[in-house]
Amino acid sequence: MQLTPEIQEEINQVRQNCGYFFMEGWSILSANGKDTLSFLQTQTTNDALQLQVGQGQSSAITDRQARLITSFSLHRMDENESWLLSDNSKTLHDHLESYHFREDVAFETLNLDLLALQGPKSMLILEKVFSSLPEKPNGIERHDFEGAPLTVIKKSLTGEEGFIICLPSELKENFTQKLVNAETQSTKIGEQAREVLRVEAGIPIFGKDMDGKNILPETGLEHSSVSYNKGCYIGQEVIARIKTYGAPNFALMGVTIEGPISPPMNGSILLGDKKIGIIKSSARSESLDKLIALAYLQKDHRSPDVEMDVSINERPFKIKTCLLPFYQASTRKEHSKKLLNEALQIYKEQENLDNPIAILREAIDIYPKHAEAYEALGVFLAKQDKLDEAIALMKRLTEINPQEIMAHTNLSVYYMKQGRIEDAENEKAEATALQFEQAVEKSMAKKMKKKEAEQRKKEM
């Protein structure tokens, strides 16, 4: 199973930049009324009553045996309305209505298009359109675009930072064009690339990796979608008992597979004559240079990093168990550092500073506290005689971190180049004072540590 160059480029775009796609098959179910949260509290596995306006959570619905009916995310819009985001909306709607009697809550599937932006630069792209964005996973914000309401949900579908824009159909074309113009460098991501990204991120989907035959603790959803402190809901007793007394017999985890042949979906994994698991979604991961798969494994075979020679539907395979996710996204700080290193490498190889400067601006946008990126950008701007901009940059850094010695040192140098002797001397004095204060603090901390060690030695 080899990926085409086009598919791999789409994957790289999401991992390094930003990709977009419309979420066909997904929809928003609105629940509205003064009893909305109290009703959902009795039906769902997570603690709906803890949600504040603008917050969200992953959740699920189970039957009395804790078998999964569906999974979704819940988002509190205002005092009375919440949204349920699901790729199984009809089942979700039908179930809730079947338990809905006198409660003041009305359900409606909204006519909205769902546009996903995924990747480390998705936030930067959306910040050009919206004044603010939700900061926490499943957080939600309402905005206006061309006089019409839009809603933004923070949600990763690929393992990277990502957002979902919920927009009326009439805005679909104009909004998409605004987001994907040449300046944003955002690429449309096809279904095959999305599947690889999803499997690498270890994200199971209902109907493929889990269904009504699975009890919820088998799926891994108990880590994100279950509150063990809330009141009663359907299936709670079984879920709580499994947590208290042991682990499910089978549970979802990752396996890597040697060789070029992908295992069949739902293929039985046999170790000798014993069935120890079942294969679910699989994909070719170029970042790992391996075939990877989600699989339900029997509890005696769920230790990570264990290699096994097995047969899957009577074909021999060599597999290795691993914890999910296969891929761990970089933090904003880590991504900013990569961009800094990229800019410095380009600077070594070419004289033109425009490209490194653009990359460093991007690094600072992604992680505004990255002092080394500020320093490098200030140096490059000074080399282009853009001293006013370099000074403004260092002042911004002193506002972010008043204890940053390097910012005051550079300001002193830049002021001196402009002939602003008094300002230069003041910044030099500030840098010297900070350096002295930090040296004193370091010395005192060292003495305190030594004193504590001596005290512990006396007490022995």
Positions of the model-derived regions?
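Acidic, proline/glycine-enriched N-terminal capping motif
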Residues: 1-69, 76
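Alpha-helical segment of the N-proximal tetratricopeptide repeat
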Residues: 332-366
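Glycine-rich, acidic
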Residues: 2-11, 104-252, 256, 325, ...
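Structural signature of tandem alpha-helical TPR/SEL1-like repeats
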Residues: 349-361, 384-396, 418-432, 451-457
